């Protein structure tokens, strides 16, 4: 089966451009004008997916092993790692299937291949939606822990957390099934873009509010101890830098993919847009990179989780 015919419906079929032969080159659009096209080698794509897979498996194993990590916050982090694991795993699986089909090593009927790709499509789309949802859930959890600290354990109970997690998984699977079924409708793509923007705005508002509260708290401590104001300014700058990195990574890794979907709706035949479409695999690679970065931001900063992770690694040896 050719490369174009094997690409996924919702995600891959949006980019009908064949894989480039050079790592970085100028491809011509319909008028012959040069387009910047970055080709991601399959080996690099699979390697990044493997790193993400191993990293997130370790996070899930560490949280499952340590009962002290069975709190609501770590449940969300564990589900984020699991969804990131599925994002990288499903993309690796589809890439491997395509390579095997092109090499003739996997000979099967067209109907069976189509069913396989439909299954992978649903898995990929639902895991992406779950990943975005759990990033938002972690932001909400941290917001409640700061602004409702005394009532946190009565608001964010483990049964409620489990119901939220179940609702996210079920809603993501059902939504992705509908998206894959009606992938050729512009409303489907716009719904995905609006969902991404909603998560971005939610995270930005919550984290900015948390930063403002932290700065107020630091300022109060400084006034109590009658220290100089530069310390407060330094804290504010560090907090702003951390917030910029957190939201910046989220936007840079996910934004290009949803920009691609937006352009598919509004300018599918435009020459400039067609140049952007040629870099679809780059956008998927950025999402894989985000699944590698997520554990570094949300999981590995925990001393308890790092200690448990060392135990898991020692046991594996």
From Swiss-Prot:
Lipid-modified residues, S-palmitoyl cysteine kind: 315
UniProt entry tagged with the keyword Chloroplast: no
Pfam families (alphabetical): 7tm_1
Keyword rRNA-binding: no
Glycosylated position list: 29
Single GO molecular function: melanocyte-stimulating hormone receptor activity
Cytoplasmic side: 64-72, 141-163, 212-240, 301-317
Regions that span the bilayer: 38-63, 73-93, 119-140, 164-183, 192-211, 241-266, 280-300
Family membership noted in the UniProt record: Belongs to the G-protein coupled receptor 1 family.
Name of the protein this chain belongs to: Melanocyte-stimulating hormone receptor
Gene transcribed to yield this protein: MC1R
């Amino acid at each position: 089966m050719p490369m174009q015919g094997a690409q996924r419906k919702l995600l891959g079929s949006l980019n009908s451009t064949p894989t480039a032969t050079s790592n970085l080159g100028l491809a011509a659009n319909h008028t012959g004008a040069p387009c910047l096209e970055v080709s991601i080698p399959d080996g690099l794509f699979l390697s990044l997916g493997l790193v993400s897979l191993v990293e997130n498996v370790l996070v899930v194993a560490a949280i499952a092993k340590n009962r002290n990590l069975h709190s609501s916050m770590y449940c969300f982090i564990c589900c984020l790692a699991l969804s990131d694991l599925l994002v990288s795993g499903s993309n690796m699986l589809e890439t491997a299937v395509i390579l095997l089909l092109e090499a003739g090593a996997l000979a099967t009927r067209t109907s069976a291949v189509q069913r396989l790709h439909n299954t992978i499509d649903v898995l990929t789309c639902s895991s992406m939606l779950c990943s975005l949802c759990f990033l938002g859930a972690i932001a909400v959890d941290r917001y409640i822990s700061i602004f409702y600290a005394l009532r946190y354990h009565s608001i964010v109970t483990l049964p409620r957390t489990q119901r939220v997690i179940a609702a996210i998984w079920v809603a993501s699977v059902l939504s992705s099934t509908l998206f894959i079924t009606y992938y050729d409708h512009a409303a489907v793509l716009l719904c995905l873009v609006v969902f991404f923007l909603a998560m971005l705005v939610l995270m930005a508002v919550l984290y900015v509010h948390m930063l403002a509260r932290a700065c107020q708290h630091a300022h109060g401590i400084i006034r109590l101890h009658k220290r100089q104001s530069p310390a407060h300014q330094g804290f504010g700058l560090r907090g702003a830098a951390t917030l910029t990195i957190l939201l910046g990574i989220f936007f840079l890794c996910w934004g290009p993919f949803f920009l691609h979907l937006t352009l598919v709706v509004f300018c599918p035949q435009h020459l400039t847009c067609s140049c952007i479409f040629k870099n679809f695999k780059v956008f998927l690679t950025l999402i894989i990179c985000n699944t590698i970065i997520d554990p570094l931001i949300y999981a590995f900063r925990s001393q308890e989780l790092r200690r448990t992770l060392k135990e898991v690694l020692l046991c594996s040896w």
